[in-house]
């Protein structure tokens, strides 16, 4: 039994074939080198071979730097058969080799000049003479795929089964390079289809490995009949090779019943063709083998204690393949090989975190242990999959296993309660994980320095730091000055935590920011990249602060027009991000990351959690990005694959927050709020005061199904319509936090610097707003019920007469409607009272 951890990724046959391939590449390079003649010399030679008079005066002892005689040059520079005869009659030997190891016949064949080939052969050239690499002229014709040259040689008696230095016949070479017509010609002249190469490989092995179906069929014809079960020196049959390299059409052809292929045969490593298909992620091939040949191969273990299921977990990049194998109900997800390791061990050892998550979610037991077969029988070294991941430095997987909550557990595990018993002794980063992280970070920084335009490169000495205006896990944010601009400086700490480092976040954020240019997205000024201790990101300074601060710390009240301006700006910024050539998903859109200008316009900021959409599959998605309170359900629950529609959900919550002035689910902690939205389909209440067009937009925006959410282009269009028609909205359209009706201006505030410049500056106090709204409401009640005098009431009288919406302990006005249940996407527009 072999040790799984020492399983080679390449076999001896692979190494040999790599050298064979390299040798033929070198052969072609040497042939091409012989054909390279200086321009001046080439012109002179063409004149010699183009004129009988000039040819008669030529020096017969002439040689080039590469040792080419006139006989060689005649084959390269347009000579004629008469020149060949004359030169050979005057004593030039056709057997003479160039410094690269080729005769004139070799060069004539490589040039595919049938006339000169015939002339050389008629004049006495040896058709079997070997040159560099033990190659004959027929080998060279086959390498180049020259059908006419090969035909001439075979007509003149070339040995069709002669072997070169690596024991390849011309048929081997034709099968390797896929020269179908040459293969047909060689078979016509009696080429042996079952002759062995240096490592026992037949032409059918080579055609199967390279995927040449038509050549495989030619080799299997009645007149040829290659042995379909022939084994090389490592007991590979042709089916092993086409399965390994994913040549589905050849697999299907070989598995035909009349060919009598043995589909479950094993090589010296114990691998069936199904093993090799799974080790290389060839899903369609694996399906074909099982559907045609049955499930016998699924139960076979190789010498490394791996079934085909283990092999698929070792490959780890095709969850569909793993799922298909499990669906056959032959191998259990917790099947242990002879050494005790499971598919989960294999996935952990090779760092396939998505597969690890899938296996855990489907019942894989992380407590099962494997033994090291290299130890003596008296020693016991049992290891869980966590230890295998730790050994290889896959710290993200270690963290996942330590904290994974199994369905039967009430609480997730932690490092002191890890079921396998070794969690409390394992801390991350692991030694190897730390080295990997440091190496990757250095590579990332070097790539970032090389790729960042020079005008974005900043020195720390160029930056003047003023007061601190914010902080986070990454470090601190300062107000400052750089290149005569007031800027915000995000200063990173150069420390590493687990596999998620500040350096990693820094590189990602800079690589994204440097590509952004939009008025509704924070403007990038530059970055300091020289030393991890000096890492900093510099952006424009937005003086109005964050939307969160404005609404919930300063408790400022905006009118509806100001709210819509902010909402439109944010939507435009997000639309820009999602429609880039390389779309960007923000992943952390919330009111903290929406910054306001003094004129009331907004920009989207903070791209520390952002990703290029195409890179999501490569990222570790076990950590939920961003703030839980604004997180889309699919991000909170799955923590795996999601789309740009996750940003739309977060935006819908921000829009509700802008309109109501309240924190979403303020009475809950962030995790509880996210859980309520994800598992109970709860959404913030939509009061009667929110305009209907916006209400419908909110309902669609926080749809439980991502596909049911609108694109940001539609959001922008709808909100701009509301902004343009704002005066048509009734006074009741003001929100539950009591915003005043907009001013009389009906202009659409699309461009910065329009009529809305003073809106933020003209904010009212909450008391003034409540007074105005309730006075308006009281007037309406008086007119309809006749209960009050027309002379007006004092504020105290109005307070007693009207029922105020209660104000909670945080100072926020509670919406008169209770929280609502939001149903699944099949009925996305319906609500029901939570009571």
Curated annotation (Swiss-Prot):
Catalytic residues as annotated in Swiss-Prot or TrEMBL: 588 (proton acceptor)
Result after altering residue 798 to I: In a head & Neck squamous cell carcinoma sample; somatic mutation
GO cellular component: cytoplasm; nucleus
Effect of residue 510 to L: Decreased autophosphorylation
PROSITE patterns, alphabetized: ANK_REP_REGION, ANK_REPEAT, PROTEIN_KINASE_ATP, PROTEIN_KINASE_DOM
Domain of life: Eukaryota
Cell location: Nucleus; Cytoplasm
InterPro entries in the record: Ankyrin_rpt, Ankyrin_rpt-contain_sf, Kinase-like_dom_sf, Prot_kinase_dom, Protein_kinase_ATP_BS, Ser-Thr/Tyr_kinase_cat_dom
Keyword Phosphoprotein annotated: yes
Protein kinase domain location: 463-723
Outcome reported for the amino acid change (mutating residue 490 to R): Loss of autophosphorylation activity
Protein purpose: May play a role in cardiac physiology.
Associated disease: Cardiac conduction disease with or without dilated cardiomyopathy: A cardiac disorder characterized by atrial tachyarrhythmia and conduction system disease. Some patients have dilated cardiomyopathy. CCDD inheritance is autosomal dominant.
Protein name: Serine/threonine-protein kinase TNNI3K
Lineage: Eukaryota, Metazoa, Chordata, Craniata, Vertebrata
């Amino acid at each position: 039994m072999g040790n799984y951890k020492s399983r080679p990724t390449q076999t001896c046959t692979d190494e040999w074939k790599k050298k064979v391939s390299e040798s033929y590449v070198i052969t072609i390079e040497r042939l091409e080198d012989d054909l390279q003649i200086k321009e001046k010399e080439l012109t002179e030679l063409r004149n010699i071979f183009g004129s009988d008079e000039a040819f008669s005066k030529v020096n017969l002892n002439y040689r080039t730097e590469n040792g080419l005689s006139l006989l060689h040059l005649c084959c390269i520079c347009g000579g004629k058969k008469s020149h060949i005869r004359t030169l050979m009659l005057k004593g030039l030997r056709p057997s003479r080799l160039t410094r690269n190891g080729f005769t004139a016949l070799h060069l004539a064949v490589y040039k595919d000049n049938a006339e000169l080939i015939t002339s050389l052969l008629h004049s006495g050239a040896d058709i079997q003479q070997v040159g560099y690499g033990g190659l004959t002229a027929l080998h060279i014709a086959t390498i180049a795929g020259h059908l006419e040259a090969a035909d001439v040689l075979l007509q003149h008696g070339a040995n069709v089964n002669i072997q070169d230095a690596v024991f390849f016949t011309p048929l081997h070479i034709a099968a390797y390079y896929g020269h179908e017509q040459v293969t047909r010609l060689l078979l016509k002249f009696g080429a042996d289809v079952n002759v062995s190469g240096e490592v026992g490989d037949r032409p059918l092995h080579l055609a199967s490995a390279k995927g040449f179906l038509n050549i495989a069929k030619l080799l299997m014809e009645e007149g040829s009949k290659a042995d379909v079960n022939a084994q090389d020196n490592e007991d590979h049959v042709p089916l092993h090779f086409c399965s390994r390299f994913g040549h589905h059409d050849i697999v299907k052809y070989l598995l035909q019943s009349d060919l009598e292929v043995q589909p479950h045969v094993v090589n010296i490593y114990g691998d069936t063709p199904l093993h090799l298909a799974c080790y290389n992620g060839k899903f369609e091939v694996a399906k074909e083998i099982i559907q045609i040949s049955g499930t016998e191969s699924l139960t076979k273990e190789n010498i490394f204690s791996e079934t085909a299921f283990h092999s698929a977990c070792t490959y780890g990049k095709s969850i569909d393949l793993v799922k298909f194998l499990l669906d056959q109900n032959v191998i259990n997800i917790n099947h242990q090989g002879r050494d005790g390791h499971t598919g989960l061990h294999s996935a952990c050892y090779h760092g396939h975190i998505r597969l690890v998550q899938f296996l855990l979610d489907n019942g894989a037991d992380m407590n099962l242990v494997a033994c090291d077969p290299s130890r003596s029988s008296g020693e016991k070294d049992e290891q869980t999959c966590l230890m295998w991941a730790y050994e290889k430095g896959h710290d993200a997987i270690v963290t996942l296993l330590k904290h994974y909550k199994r369905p039967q557990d009430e609480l997730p595990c932690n490092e002191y309660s890890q079921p396998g018993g070794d969690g409390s002794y394992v801390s991350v980063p692991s030694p190897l994980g730390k080295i990997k992280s440091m190496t990757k970070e250095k590579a990332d920084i070097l790539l970032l320095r090389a790729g960042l335009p020079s005008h974005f490169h900043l020195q720390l000495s160029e930056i003047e730091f003023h007061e601190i205006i914010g902080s986070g896990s990454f470090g601190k944010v300062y107000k400052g000055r750089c290149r005569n601009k007031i800027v915000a400086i995000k200063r990173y700490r150069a420390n590493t935590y687990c596999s998620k480092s500040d350096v990693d976040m820094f590189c990602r954020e800079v690589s994204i920011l440097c590509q952004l240019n939009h008025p509704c997205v924070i403007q990038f000024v530059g970055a300091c990249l020289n030393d991890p201790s000096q890492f900093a990101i510099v952006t424009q300074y937005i003086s109005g602060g964050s939307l969160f601060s404005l609404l919930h710390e300063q408790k400022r009240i905006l009118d509806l027009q100001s709210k819509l301006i902010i909402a439109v700006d944010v939507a435009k910024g997000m639309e820009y991000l999602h429609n880039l050539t390389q779309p960007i998903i923000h992943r952390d859109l919330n009111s903290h990351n929406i910054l306001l200008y003094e004129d009331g316009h907004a920009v989207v900021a903070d791209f520390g959690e952002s990703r290029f959409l195409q890179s999501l599959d490569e990222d570790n998605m076990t950590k939920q990005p961003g703030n839980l309170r604004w997180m889309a359900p699919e991000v909170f629950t799955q923590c795996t694959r999601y789309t740009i529609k996750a940003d739309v959900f977060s935006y819908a919550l921000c829009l509700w927050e802008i309109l109501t002035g309240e924190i979403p689910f303020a009475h809950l902690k962030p995790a509880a709020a996210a859980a309520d939205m994800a598992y109970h389909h709860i959404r913030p209440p939509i009061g009667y005061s929110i305009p209907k067009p916006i209400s419908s937009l909110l309902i669609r925006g926080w749809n439980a199904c991502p596909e049911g959410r609108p694109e940001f282009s539609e959001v922008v269009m709808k909100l701009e319509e509301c902004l343009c028609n704002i005066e048509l909205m009734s006074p009741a359209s003001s929100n539950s936090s009591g915003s005043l009706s907009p001013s009389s201006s009906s202009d659409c505030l699309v461009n910065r610097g329009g009529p809305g410049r003073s809106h933020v500056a003209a904010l009212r106090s909450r008391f003034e707003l409540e007074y105005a709204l309730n006075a308006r409401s009281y007037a309406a009640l008086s007119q309809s019920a006749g209960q009050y005098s027309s002379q007006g009431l004092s504020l105290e009288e109005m307070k007693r007469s009207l029922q105020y919406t209660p104000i909670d302990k945080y100072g926020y006005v509670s919406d008169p409607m209770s929280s609502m249940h939001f149903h699944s996407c099949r009925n996305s527009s319906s609500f029901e009272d939570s009571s």
